[in-house]
Amino acid sequence: MGEIEQKPTPASRLGAPENSGISTLERGQKPPPTPSGKLMTVKIQMLDDTQEAFEVPQRAPGKVLFDAVCNHLNLVEGDYFGLEFPDHRKIVVWLDLLKPIVKQIRRPKHVLVKFVVKFFPPDHTQLQEELTRYLFALQVKQDLAQGRLTCNDTSAALLISHIVQSEIGDFDEALDREHLAKNKYVPQQDALEDKIVEFHHSHIGQTPAESDFQLLEVARRLEMYGIRLHPAKDREGTKINLAVANTGILVFQGFTKINAFNWAKVRKLSFKRKRFLIKLRPDVNSSYQDTLEFLMAGRDFCKSFWKICVEHHAFFRLFEEPKPKPKPVLFSRGSSFRFSGRTQKQVLDYVKEGGHKKVQFERKHSKIHSTRSLVSQPTAPNSEVPKQSPQSASLTFGEGTESPSAQSCQQAKETKVCTLEPGPRQSPALSKSPSGSKAADGTAAAAPPEEEDEEEGGKDGIRPSNPQPPQPSTGSLTGSPHLSELSINSQGGAAPANVTLSPNLSPDNKQASPLISPLLNDQACPRTDDEEEGRRKRFPTDKAYYIAKEVSTTERTYLKDLEVIASWFQSTVSKEDSMPEALKSLIFPNFEPLHKFHTNFLKEIEQRLALWEGRSNAHIRGDYQRIGDVMLKNIQGMKHLAAHLWKHSEALEALETSIKGSRRLEHFCRDFELQKVCYLPLNTFLLRPLHRLMHYKQVLERLCKHHPPNHADFRDCRAALAEITEMVAQLHGTMIKMENFQKLHELKKDLIGIDNLVIPGREFIRLGSLSKLSGKGLQQRMFFLFNDVLLYTSRGLTASNQFKVHGQLPLYGMTIEESEEEWGVPHCLTLRGQRQSIIVAASSRSEMEKWLEDIQMAIDLAEKSNGPTPELLASSPPDNKSPDEATAADQESEDDLSASRTSLERQAPHRGNTMVHVCWHRSTSVSMVDFSIAVENQLSGNLLRKFKNSNGWQKLWVVFTNFCLFFYKSHQDSHPLASLPLLGYSLTIPSESENIHKDYVFKLHFKSHVYYFRAESEYTFERWMEVIRSATSSASRAHSLSHKESHLY
């Protein structure tokens, strides 16, 4: 590898350290042995116009040279790029990665190879690395200067203003005009100078990374973005230009697009001499197959364009790289060319799963000056804060979010110990990245076209392959807004913008465990094996003791939840005049008596357990090995508080009504939800007293089942069970109604584009991630099923971190059917509404069956009710368009997916770990039945967590609720240190090969993330397995309903 001429490479200017780089080979594959022999020097021109010389063996395949360039740049997402050069016929072609370099570049001393962008994704948020987006921005800058990216003056000025912001920083008119005089970005730049300066003034505070992102946001909407024109003629001899994009083949007349052939419509591509042929699929109502013919300058031009089409189709439409064709025994017909490298789907999965060593870097622009504070503003487009200071050091925790109070963390080469020093609480702000969706936009949707060289008679057919199972990754997803696998986000919501996700603590570097925090790491905590074994032997062995202990541990958590409203929320409200007095008098006077009562209840339970364990009054211990009398006494006391319990539903409705009518109160409540103590949505805490009654009922059922009828505690337990069952039955209807009401309001906060989600009569049924088939292929969408309508949304990179509603399908008159064979997509469903039809695909067969069952049930209910009521119809977005107009509008909205807000449209942070986001990142779904079952399956207590790199165990206080594990140092902590959403995880018992050698250990596993936890007894082990299994393995609807019916509220 040679030396750079004068200027450093993009990676070195960004401060990226040298490393071995990332190969484009899939995991488990080994690169072909590099041929020995004579070396050849190849000059590569980078996107910043610097040149680099590389020495490679002459007989080496093109992949060796391409990988050397990617390694030199430390480029992870190198598959979007390619090397182009003029061949001996002066035709600009792409370097074939499989052929020997010497057969392609015959005179390397006289050929300049260019490293450029080859595949332009439809959505720049799919580019997950800042370096990748920077290189794309350089490509846009280059295309502007060369006249490839044509646009109007306003768009050109806006693009240049973002480039100037990235290069020189915040607005300074004199500096701007001096810079524009020295740098020409477009041929007629002088006429645009005033507009450029005006636009640049609006970008104050925008970081270079944000400028790159906004540049791509503007560029991707231009018709000529990523378009490379190839001159041709149609059958009539009219001069046209052909181009290929992620969607298919495009036809231009000049710079105006006049036709487009989507991949789904193309059956076969071929060429014969200088004729390029496109064979289309027949229409639904016709068996006639249309074949289009275009004439190009010659066979070489024709074949070159055909190869480009083959590669674009494979990259954007296939799940995995097509397998090579077997060599013919006798005769060889047709082209042997095939796409080589990872598909976009594989690239997205590879980066998301953390299958690489994240390179931490900072931009080094000598003239950068920005007035924006990283603390005060959300950094919407950044996948990571470019510059990390000691005050914003970060800790990765699984796939990693961060500790807001991190003050210092040494690099692992120095020490593994990370420390936290107390500091002022930072203003919560989101640090998000424009990451791509789980399913690639453009993965295999319909049966793809065959590509063949008819002149030589061969076929290079490309068929969609089944996606490979996810490979285990060893790194953490740093710099991503994705849900942390075990996140140190003690707020349970948005993470501070001034905290970066450091890759230097990832397991790849053997530096720290994915389960690490200053309070949860190997060095900071003593080993607890001997101590815990001793304590466990002193505990009683009776199952009734552990049932009673469960009452104590869960009561502690319940008391903390009451304090969120009675103490923390009330204290915050008293400091600000943002809540009406009537609302205050409805909420707080009904929580304070409950808090006082349950404080005394907990003391009684703990005193009884102390006697049971023999820690005091050992001579009378036998008389106190029971809990039924305590439960009966206090449940009878609760009946006197029933009036307060009835008020909680009224308080919830009043709060949501007030929030709807007061922007100030809405912002106040949203800010409170971002505080550390509010680890769940605020309205969830208002329903906690109703949920707690069910837990008492379950505990008493277990006690009655455990004790024989002649046991001293049986009579009290049975009497207490009768009392609590009566209370639960009285509140049953209210609880069902309020859970639906609370869920609708929670979903409303996650959605934008619909204002009337919560109306009387609307019921939530299921939410989850599905892939929607469109002209761009399969694109990940979040679907929300209600009893009257099915909404689908996309997750754009917005400062609010919400999902944008893009379409709605009324259920009345809808039909649903499986359509895997028709579209060639696994787990595919076709939904046909009265005005619109869509095709969706689930991530698995079980997910498809859940959606099929729930949607069909909702359709049947809509049919029985003879269509939606007028009120339900009025709640839906207006839809008076004709079917054609509706389709066009839907297509338009598809082009607008994932669009980010500009820096002038920043919104307040939004909780980023809601169930909607978990389902999005785990590609799963959850129903209202699941939510109701989750309410019943809540548990608290001490667990031992195994250290990743040693045999030690660490004691943690763990709370399981809302499909998530929350971790505390002890039960006295006011807020969790970390959280682990469990949807998508598998729950198993460790095998002998894992060398755990301890009793009562269970294992949680998701992709490369593995955690071992240890319970104190057989009963607690079974209880943890039971409640966690309810979240990790969602049962079928029929099973869920039967379970639900067997547990009456």
Curated annotation (Swiss-Prot):
Keywords on record: Cell membrane, Cell projection, Cytoplasm, Developmental protein, Guanine-nucleotide releasing factor, Membrane, Phosphoprotein, Repeat, Synapse, Synaptosome
InterPro entries: Band_41_domain, DBL_dom_sf, DH_dom, Ez/rad/moesin-like, FA, FARP1/FARP2/FRMD7_FERM_C, FERM/acyl-CoA-bd_prot_sf, FERM_2
Superkingdom assignment: Eukaryota
A Pfam family annotated for this UniProt entry: PH
A molecular function (GO) term: small GTPase binding
Single GO cellular component term: cytosol
One Gene Ontology biological process: enzyme-linked receptor protein signaling pathway
Main location class: membrane
Record's subcellular location: Cell membrane; Synapse; Synapse, Synaptosome; Cytoplasm, Cytosol
The keyword Membrane is assigned to this record: yes
Alphabetized SMART domains for the sequence: B41 (SM00295), FA (SM01195), FERM_C (SM01196), PH (SM00233), RhoGEF (SM00325)
Tissue spec: Detected in forbrain (at protein level).
Function: May play a role in semaphorin signaling. Functions as a guanine nucleotide exchange factor for RAC1. Plays a role in the assembly and disassembly of dendritic filopodia, the formation of dendritic spines, regulation of dendrite length and ultimately the formation of synapses.
Protein name: FERM, ARHGEF and pleckstrin domain-containing protein 1
Taxonomic lineage from the root: Eukaryota, Metazoa, Chordata, Craniata, Vertebrata
